[in-house]
């Protein structure tokens, strides 16, 4: 007797804008991991530019459907959070109206939670996971009274809609602590599912190999900092520590990061860092990678011969990988990072990491001095203090000479166990297994909401059309053909019949 076929679970991701940011990388990795584990996966998004997305999306490995891209992302440069929520609600409405809403066993939503109640009400047999990268209300700027007032309803909406999810995931224990302080009225204990890094090595472009030969001579050693050119990244910590270190004469410091010519902070901050380097008597040079890639022959190696600091802007992913592979140490300067993916990208190559002892690095980096016999060490965690950092730079030289293989072994091992795509998808898989059979139970809001909505619509219709009965027949048609709600259809037909035949 043949066995019955096993049901293939269907998972839908709902994400606002499928670009190339950190949140998008997590969604793509989670989707690909679950797909490889046997799930039927679809990503729904309000926007996806196939020329500006990750390879798994570009080459069709993952199924992506766009809904609502025609809706505006802002109104005269303002109201972006309002537009983002409306775009997500439209996307969800489209799933409801087309009947796709009931096709999926699990919905995984991130960044915006406004659609969660609609999923809860219209897909009662599905489960909803919400992945919180960080509370949105803590990321929003509140300059002035009007902006503070404008944010209030969205803060309330975020807390309520997030609490409707069947389970909530966060990207680190640090975010979990912030979540608990921010959403104190939610009796929720989020589960930590760490983001991952791709353990496969990216192909290095010949152009980037040639550039490395130009900027490094005679096997010169260098430290590396990778961050966006933003003041909150505290890149001056790396520069000052390097200036105070004895290694300034034998090493270089490469500052690499995202840089937008249309972003005034990026431009101003780079100038501030260059000024700091000059004040510290460190010779420096700036290389714009986009300009270099257009005319590599116009960039001779003599430009870099005496430079102690090299500021690199907008480098390719290929050059970034090459820089990480060859550096002596990654200097990760931000404080209170929600997670921080760059240390993982360094550790996968066996590169030690020096990071600030707050936020995500506390969970990703194993401090050299905090482990017995330095077992499992992957770097150093220190306060955001240049003196402390310069000491590590000097002390690390002897450590590398005696036992550099320690980091070469420990980094990749830790990545594979905790931060690989397989590890992350396994955590998602276990979470889905846990909630898929869990009874949702009855919630007061979900019981009252449909009735309150029907009453509101009926009251508004009565005010607008008076005793006319035809609007209710129209509402019945909309409920059946658009909303596909049998209960609402029957209700409006009863109202229609009552108005027509009660007199």
Curated annotation (Swiss-Prot):
Record-level GO cellular component terms: endoplasmic reticulum membrane
Pathway assignment: Protein modification; protein glycosylation
Keywords: Endoplasmic reticulum, Glycoprotein, Glycosyltransferase, Membrane, Transferase, Transmembrane, Transmembrane helix
Catalytic activity: a beta-D-Man-(1->4)-beta-D-GlcNAc-(1->4)-alpha-D-GlcNAc-diphospho-di-trans,poly-cis-dolichol + GDP-alpha-D-mannose = an alpha-D-Man-(1->3)-beta-D-Man-(1->4)-beta-D-GlcNAc-(1->4)-alpha-D-GlcNAc-diphospho-di-trans,poly-cis-dolichol + GDP + H(+); an alpha-D-Man-(1->3)-beta-D-Man-(1->4)-beta-D-GlcNAc-(1->4)-alpha-D-GlcNAc-diphospho-di-trans,poly-cis-dolichol + GDP-alpha-D-mannose = an alpha-D-Man-(1->3)-[alpha-D-Man-(1->6)]-beta-D-Man-(1->4)-beta-D-GlcNAc-(1->4)-alpha-D-GlcNAc-diphospho-di-trans,poly-cis-dolichol + GDP + H(+)
One annotated GO molecular function: GDP-Man:Man1GlcNAc2-PP-Dol alpha-1,3-mannosyltransferase activity
EC number: 2.4.1.132, 2.4.1.257
Stored Pfam families: Glyco_transf_4, Glycos_transf_1
Membrane-spanning parts: 444-466, 473-495
Keyword NAD appears in the UniProt entry: no
Glycosylation site list: 59, 173, 262, 403, 500
Record membrane topology: Multi-pass membrane protein
Protein's GO biological process: protein glycosylation
InterPro entries, per database record: ALG2 (IPR027054), Glyco_trans_1 (IPR001296), Glyco_trans_4-like_N (IPR028098)
Top enzyme category: transferase
Chief place where the protein resides: endoplasmic reticulum
Cellular location(s): Endoplasmic reticulum membrane
Keyword flag Cell division: no
Functional summary from the UniProt entry: Mannosylates Man(2)GlcNAc(2)-dolichol diphosphate and Man(1)GlcNAc(2)-dolichol diphosphate to form Man(3)GlcNAc(2)-dolichol diphosphate.
Family: Belongs to the glycosyltransferase group 1 family.
Protein name per the record: Alpha-1,3/1,6-mannosyltransferase ALG2
Species of origin: Kluyveromyces lactis (strain ATCC 8585 / CBS 2359 / DSM 70799 / NBRC 1267 / NRRL Y-1140 / WM37) (Yeast)
């Amino acid at each position: 007797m043949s066995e019955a076929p096993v049901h293939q679970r269907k998972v839908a991701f709902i994400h606002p804008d499928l670009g190339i940011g950190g949140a998008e990388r997590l969604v793509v990795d989670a989707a690909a991991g679950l797909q490889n584990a046997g799930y039927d996966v679809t990503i729904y998004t309000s926007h996806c530019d196939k020329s500006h997305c990750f390879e798994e999306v570009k080459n069709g490995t993952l199924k992506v459907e766009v809904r609502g891209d025609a809706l505006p992302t802002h109104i005269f440069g303002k109201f972006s959070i309002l537009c983002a929520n409306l775009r997500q609600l439209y996307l969800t409405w489209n799933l409801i109206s087309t009947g796709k809403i009931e096709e999926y066993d699990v919905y995984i939503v991130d960044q915006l939670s406004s659609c969660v109640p609609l999923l809860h009400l219209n897909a009662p047999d599905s489960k909803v996971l919400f992945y919180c990268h960080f509370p949105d209300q803590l990321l929003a700027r509140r300059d002035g009274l009007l902006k503070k007032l404008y944010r209030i309803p969205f803060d309330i909406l975020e807390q309520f809609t997030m609490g409707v999810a069947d389970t909530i995931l966060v990207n680190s224990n640090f975010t979990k602590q912030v979540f608990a302080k921010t959403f104190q009225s939610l009796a929720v204990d989020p589960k930590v599912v760490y983001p991952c890094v791709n353990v496969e090595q990216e192909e290095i472009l010949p152009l980037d190999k040639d550039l490395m030969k130009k900027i490094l001579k005679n096997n010169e050693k260098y430290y590396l900092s990778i961050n966006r050119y933003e003041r909150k990244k505290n890149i001056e910590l790396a520069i000052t520590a390097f200036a105070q270190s004895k290694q300034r004469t034998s090493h270089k410091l490469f500052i690499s990061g995202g840089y937008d010519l249309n972003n005034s902070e990026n431009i101003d901050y780079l100038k501030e860092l260059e000024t700091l380097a000059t004040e510290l008597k460190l010779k420096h040079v700036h290389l714009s990678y986009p300009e270099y890639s257009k005319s590599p022959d116009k960039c001779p190696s003599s430009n870099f011969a005496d430079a102690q600091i090299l500021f690199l802007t907008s480098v390719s992913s290929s050059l970034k990988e090459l820089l990480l592979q060859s550096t002596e140490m990654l200097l990760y300067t931000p404080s209170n990072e929600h997670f921080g993916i760059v240390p993982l990208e360094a550790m996968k190559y066996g590169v030690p990491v020096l990071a600030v002892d707050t936020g995500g690095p506390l969970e990703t980096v194993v401090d050299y001095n905090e482990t017995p016999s330095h077992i499992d060490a992957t770097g150093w965690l220190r306060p955001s203090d240049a003196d402390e950092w310069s000491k590590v730079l000097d002390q690390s030289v002897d450590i590398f000479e005696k036992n550099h293989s320690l980091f070469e072994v420990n980094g990749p091992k830790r990545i594979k166990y905790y931060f690989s795509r397989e590890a992350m998808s396994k955590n998602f898989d276990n979470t889905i297994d846990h909630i898929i059979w869990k009874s949702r139970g009855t919630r007061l809001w979900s019981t009252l909401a449909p009735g309150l909505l029907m009453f509101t619509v009926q009251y508004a219709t009565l005010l607008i059309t008076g005793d006319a009965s035809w609007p209710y027949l129209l509402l019945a048609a909309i409920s059946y053909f658009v909303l596909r709600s049998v209960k609402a259809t029957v209700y409006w037909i009863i109202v229609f019949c009552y108005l027509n035949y009660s007199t």
